[in-house]
Amino acid sequence: NGNKINITYEGHSFMLKFPPHPSRNKEMSYTNGCISEYVACHIFGMLGFRVQDTLLGNYVDSRGKSKLVVACRDFTEDGKKLMEFAHLKNTCIDSEQNGYGKELSSILEAIDEQTLYPADELRAFFWDMFIADALLGNFDRHNGNWGLLVDEEAQSVEIAPVYDCGSCLY
């Protein structure tokens, strides 16, 4: 992953993601991650998912060097808080692994055991996201980059928009 900074654009908060420095193995470099993030998010959107808003742009640094970046709009700016599935999974007493454990059976058990969101809807979303990630070649979906949005004031919970798609399309 490259560097990230926060900016305000047209009155909204965005996280700018910069490409990482190229690795020694240029063929397996993540320098296209910004393009992948943008394109994959738009494909997820075309598939019917709620997804983070993304923009492609150029960032000119203090030395005048231009870099391709992706801007990801903050979907928590309305006071909602992101609860990563890893945190939700940690609240499940019977979970055999920590929140980041990747065993499918443990993930499905946590989906069934959690009480914040209807389990059948969360399970359906998980499988839909799983299939879309597979179609897009996302090798980096884990329990820390999907989850729920919690609005404590309104006492409501919803599935967070799909985000962190920079490892797709490789």
Residue ranges of model-derived segments:
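Conserved kinase catalytic-core segment
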Residues: 105-169
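ATP-dependent phospho-/nucleotidyl transfer catalytic cores
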Residues: 71-130
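Conserved ATP-binding subdomain of kinase catalytic cores across diverse folds
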Residues: 1-95
